[in-house]
A protein has these predicted regions:
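Hydrophobic, proline/glycine-rich low-complexity stretches
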Residues: 1-72, 202, 211-249
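Long, hydrophobic/aromatic-enriched structural stretches that serve as scaffold segments
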Residues: 56-57, 62-95
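Alpha-helical membrane-targeting segments
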Residues: 66-81, 103-127, 274, 328-368
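Internal, well-folded beta-alpha domain core
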Residues: 87-249
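Flexible coil/turn and secondary-structure edge motifs
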Residues: 256, 266, 280, 364-365, ...
Length: 376
């Protein structure tokens, strides 16, 4: 595996914030079947388009080893950072960004299976199993729910190591650098940065596959995948899960959304603009605008029910005083120094101050006949 992370092959830029996790994906067997798109659709959240190659939808079954999984600021931990994983995935896209959607992620890791579903909405489930090499073959096996969902087989690697050719089916299946999930009532996207896949052709002997059969995708030959590949793996950086709905094509652009029905909005945007640091990448929208409404409707319900100040920063949603305080991060250094101090004010006091401003803003700032809050 290569240690450096290249960017020249990426179909879109990675977020300009620090990645959250480092990990290695090792000893992967990729098995693929074509599936009936209508039988696949109920398993894919609304808002995602099932991606196809020459009119065909695919699912992939991938047993492999997760190695050295750790926060980007920490070291690999024995007994926690290495474990076998077995996932079933399909291929989707949203707003032109192709990615992967997981139907299930089976892993022999209590930490991952408890943390990932709650934090990211990823469908991790604890399963016993292994991925190990015996002689010249890779052996893999998983079992969940007292053997109700099982997978077992072997992989024999054949051929030379290659990379996917442009426009090929292998490029469609392998070269994806984002994942999608549905979490807390909203569609989320996560970015994954790794070098281009190197793989070999392979053949497998599947002896059990009730894991895939459970999804009732209409696969006739459940023990005979149509395509089989093997890869020694890649080193991976993953980024925090963010709101999948975006305004515009710049994934690194943040947005401040305000109600737009009083002069306060325009004054606030003007105040920020005059004091913005050169590297700030912040746009503005009134809440009533079409693209702002699109974002608000995509937010978790606890956010979308409130007409308030929203800040979409690094794909995360903040509102009311939490949004206002974070606006300091876009400003010059002598304003940013107030950022940690503002958090010392207790939340109840901040909420009272926010409600007072919201209640009397029309008396202090006369409501204009036409919204002057600029769109940028």
């Amino acid at each position: 595996m290569e240690d450096d992370f290249r960017v020249d092959h990426l179909p879109f830029p990675m977020p300009n914030r620090r990645h959250t996790l480092d990990q290695d994906w090792r000893f992967l067997t990729f098995m693929h079947w074509r599936v009936d798109i209508e039988k696949l659709r109920p398993h894919v959240p609304e808002g995602l388009e099932i991606d196809t190659f020459e009119g065909n939808a695919y699912i992939g079954l991938v047993p492999f080893m997760m190695k050295h999984v750790r926060p980007s600021w920490f070291v690999s931990t024995p007994g926690v950072s290495n474990f076998p994983e077995f996932n079933i995935r399909t291929y989707v896209k949203k707003d032109g960004i192709a990615g992967v959607f997981f139907l299930t992620l089976e892993a022999k890791s209590l930490v991952t299976c408890n943390f990932a579903p709650r934090t990211y909405g990823l469908p991790y489930r604890y399963a016993s199993g292994y991925v190990k090499k015996i002689g010249e073959q890779w052996n893999w096996k998983s079992s969940r729910n007292k053997g109700q969902f099982r997978l077992a087989g072997t992989t024999e690697v054949i051929g030379q190591e290659v990379q996917a050719e442009s426009g090929s089916l292998e490029e469609f299946l392998f070269e994806r650098y984002s994942l999608y999930t549905s979490h807390k009532g909203s569609l989320r996207r996560g970015y994954t940065h790794h070098n281009k896949w190197k793989f070999q052709h392979a053949k497998v002997e599947l002896t059990e596959n009730s894991l895939t059969e459970n999804f009732n995708l209409g696969i006739d030959e459940i023990l005979t995948p149509e395509l089989v590949h093997y890869s020694n793996g890649v080193r991976v950086r993953t980024y925090s899960i963010e709101l999948a709905e975006r305004i515009g094509s710049d994934i690194n652009r943040d947005f401040l959304l305000l109600d737009g029905d009083c002069g306060l909005c325009h004054r606030l945007a003007t105040f920020l603009d005059k004091r913005m640091k050169p590297s700030a990448n912040l746009g503005y929208r009134p809440n009533s605008s079409k693209d702002a409404q699109m974002l608000i409707q995509a937010m978790p319900k606890k956010y979308s029910e409130s007409d308030t100040v929203y800040l979409i920063r690094d794909g995360q949603v903040y509102m009311r005083s939490s949004a206002a305080i974070r606006c300091l991060l876009y400003m010059k250094w002598y304003y940013r120094m107030w950022y940690p101090i503002c958090w010392l004010v207790p939340l109840p006091i901040r909420d009272i101050a926010y409600r007072i401003v919201a209640k009397y803003r029309h008396k202090v700032f006369k409501k204009p006949k036409v919204c002057t809050f600029r769109v940028d």
